[in-house]
Amino acid sequence: MEPSIVLAATPIGNDGDASPRLKQEIERADVIAAEDTRRFLTLAGRLGVEPSGRILSYYEHNEADRGPYLLELARTQRVLVVTDAGMPSVSDPGYRLVARARGAGVPVTVVPGPSAVLTALATSGLATDRFSFEGFAPRKGGERDRFLGALAGEPRTMVFFESPRRLPETLAAMVEAFGADREACVCRELTKTHEEVVRASLGELAGRFRADVLGEIAVVVAGADPLAADLGVAVEESLALEAAGLRLKDAAAHVAGRVGLRKKDVYEAAIARRG
């Protein structure tokens, strides 16, 4: 087979979703770069396929050293790249390997398949015409709040990953950043036996998921209403002008007039934001 790098999606919870092409690539690849070699071998066993190539680990903490090595191998061999679940390069260092390969003229091909991002988006019932994948929110409170705050005005549907242990505090932080009324969906254990999908407002979800849960989590959040997004920007500008020395009431009036909002709405929202 042609020397190249092959990115292949693996099941995110249901082995029945493994494609015939995935099984074929596992059997034929000269080298298999797996996020966790033991989990990969377990998956191959369940799928009834026997890898014929060398199996190497490839994950975030060895990517800097292993990536260039895999690229060199791909000049003369077929290198299959897989993660524990889903598509390599999504919340995964695989994209850097692809970037290097493209720059070096090494062929890259993709075996499509299961994706937690698209599965969560599809089952959420939220708008799919425009969306963004935001990965995991930062673990530390201050960094997480700034991360989410910067997305408060994002008009596209947003998809996040989260660990079961941090889900309660992340939902609470989303309530603060996006508002309790923003529609969202918590997706747990997608495609698995105990799959759970709960759509409600962020406030309701934060109340429901107060304790740690089990399983893989994706959270889908509706984009901001355009008017609310404009108001959020106006509030930030007003507070910035106040910090520069202008009275908040005057700052709100100035910004409201410029963007076409009611000065009362901007002023009251700025007071609420300031606390």
Question: What do these predicted ranges mean?
Answer:
Residues 5, 131-153:
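A short, charged helix-loop
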Residues 2, 78, 157, 161-275:
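A contiguous loop/helix-start segment that scaffolds small-molecule binding in enzyme catalytic cores
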Residues 34, 83, 110-113, 160, ...:
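General beta-strand structural signal in soluble alpha/beta enzymes
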Residues 75-138:
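Short glycine-cluster motifs
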Residues 26-32, 105-109, 157-158:
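Short active-site oxyanion
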Residues 67-75, 150, 210:
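Short amphipathic alpha-helix with an adjacent loop that forms part of the alpha/beta core around
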Residues 1-61:
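Glycine-rich, flexible N-terminal cofactor/catalytic loop recognition
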Residues 56-64, 137-140:
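Conserved helicase motor
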